[in-house]
Amino acid sequence: MQKLIMGNWKMNGNSTSIKELCSGISQVQYDTSRVAIAVFPSSVYVKEVISQLPEKVGVGLQNITFYDDGAYTGEISARMLEDIGCDYLLIGHSERRSLFAESDEDVFKKLNKIIDTTITPVVCIGESLDDRKSGKLKQVLATQLSLILENLSVEQLAKVVIAYEPVWAIGTGVVASLEQIQETHQFIRSLLAKVDERLAKNIKIVYGGSLKAENAKDILSLPDVDGGLIGGASLKAAEFNEIINQANKICTE
């Protein structure tokens, strides 16, 4: 299966640094049949990034509102996202859930606004360290996915990318063990299999949690890991490109 490598730039960068980053990423060579690339800049730089990257590199937004239009100061709608030429959308990132109190219902409502457009939604799920230690991992992940799996058709679900991000491993330098990553991805795939076996086999489940060049080969080689959602390492073109190179090599072996 084609690997999907995505960079979440979060609230980082300025016009100068982003131009340098785009220039660096534009240099990486990879087989587009084996690897797909996407980046998520801050919304004010999306148009700049689209114009500065090769067409083969997808560009997405980090968040939208679930309203269509109207008096919602500061918000961005799904229609606007499509209008400016975005390819991807992050939904439910752990920082949105923890810092802005986004609920599973909010995540579903945002997904519902985007699911029938040309934009690929990347739905983020993950557990806290307390959840894992108390044995609630499976319960938490199943709950986070329940509204989505119960209310979308198989055809709609097939458009979704799922990003598993253990909250305790994001931005901390702590990485889940390979066994933990594989077991969790396998569990997520088993939830999807209850809906449809073919869906479970073909849907992309990517890992996000301190993934970097030094551990990319091991993580991306796991059988149920279809790519990565990279944070800090995606802000350095050389490191992000090395992760892309590792993914490309894995898919050619």
UniProtKB/Swiss-Prot annotation:
Pfam families: TIM. Keywords: Cytoplasm, Gluconeogenesis, Glycolysis, Isomerase. Coiled coil: none annotated. Substrate binds at residues 8-10, 171, 210, 231-232. One of its GO terms (molecular function) is triose-phosphate isomerase activity. Its main location: cytoplasm. InterPro entries: Aldolase_TIM, TIM_sf, TrioseP_Isoase_bac/euk, Triosephosphate_isomerase, Triosephosphate_isomerase_AS. Pathway: Carbohydrate biosynthesis; gluconeogenesis; Carbohydrate degradation; glycolysis; D-glyceraldehyde 3-phosphate from glycerone phosphate: step 1/1. One of its GO terms (cellular component) is cytosol. GO terms for biological process: gluconeogenesis; glyceraldehyde-3-phosphate biosynthetic process; glycerol catabolic process; glycolytic process. It catalyses: D-glyceraldehyde 3-phosphate = dihydroxyacetone phosphate. It is found in: Cytoplasm. Homodimer. Involved in the gluconeogenesis. Catalyzes stereospecifically the conversion of dihydroxyacetone phosphate (DHAP) to D-glyceraldehyde-3-phosphate (G3P). NCBIfam families: tim. PANTHER family: TRIOSEPHOSPHATE ISOMERASE. Belongs to the triosephosphate isomerase family. This is Triosephosphate isomerase. The gene is tpiA.
